[in-house]
Amino acid sequence: MKPSIYRFPLAIQMVLPDDYRHNQAFNQELKLLQHYGFTGIELNIANIEAVNLDDIQRFLNAYDLVLTMFASGLTAKTHGLSLSSPDVTIRSRSVAACHQFIDLLQGRHIGIIIGFLKGGPAKDAARAKTDFRDSMRQIAVHAQAKKVHVIIEATNRYESCVANTVEETARMVDDLDNPYLHILPDTFHMNIEEIDANTALRTHQDKFISVHISDNNRHYPGLGAIDFHPVFQTLAAMDYNGPVVIEGNLRKDFSADIHASMAYLTTVLKKEPDV
C-alpha cells in the first residue's frame, strides 16, 4: 500500500460496478480518490464468486488503491442472507456463504466485513443474539483455518438487534477468542449507541483494525454535526495505525460530496509535524 499523506491511511467503501473497467463514472470517481491521496478501498460486490479478484486489484492499482475489505452488505441484500435469522435454513445458507467468501479471499490480505449480514431487528432479540453467536462461532473457526480476518461491525439498534454497541461486539469477540475476529467501530452508529465514542474506542482499542467514519446524518465526514478532531486525537493517542474509512450516503453526488468532505478532512487528518 502506498504511504499515506494523512495521520492514518484513508479509505472509502464503494459498490463495484459490473463493468468497472469501462464504467466512466466509476473511473472518474477513482481518479478523484487518487487526487486526494486515498490508499484503500472496501468494495460491495453482489456476487463475489463471479468476479476476478486479481483483475480488480490490478485495476485499482492504477489509481494507487488497494482492496482492503470485502463489504458483504450488498451480497446479503441480493441473496437474502442473515446470520441471526430465526429460520435455520437461512442461517445455514448465510454461514455457508461466509465460508465461501473466506475461501475466495484466502491469501489475499483482504478482510470481510459483517454488518448488514448480521440480520435486522427481530421480535425475539435474545434468540437472535444466540443464533448470531452460533453462526459467528462456525465462521470464526473457518476464518482461522484460512487466515482471513473477519470484522463484525457494531451497528445501531434500528438496523440490527445484535452487536449494537462497541462493548457488546467486543464482548462477543472476547468470548469467541479467535485472533482473526475483530470489531468495527463506526462513528455514525456510535453517535446513536455510545455514551462517549472516544471512551469506547480507548477501552476496546485492541479489538479493531479499521474504523468507519461517517457523520451523524449518515453523510460523509464534515457534512453533519460530528466533530472528528477528538476522534482522530483519540486514535493517535493510542498509536492506532489502521485505516479510517469513509462509509456513508451521498448528499448530492459523489464528486461534490468528496470535495466537501475532503475540505474538512484534510485539515483534521493532517499529519502532526515531527518534533
PLM region spans:
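Histidine-acidic metal/acid-base catalytic patches
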Residues: M1-Q34, A163, E167-P185, H189-V275
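Active-site acidic/histidine proton-transfer and metal-coordination neighborhood
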Residues: Q24, S84-H182
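Alpha-helical scaffolding segments of alpha/beta enzyme cores, especially the outer helices
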Residues: Q28-L32, D54-R58, A62, R93-G107, ...
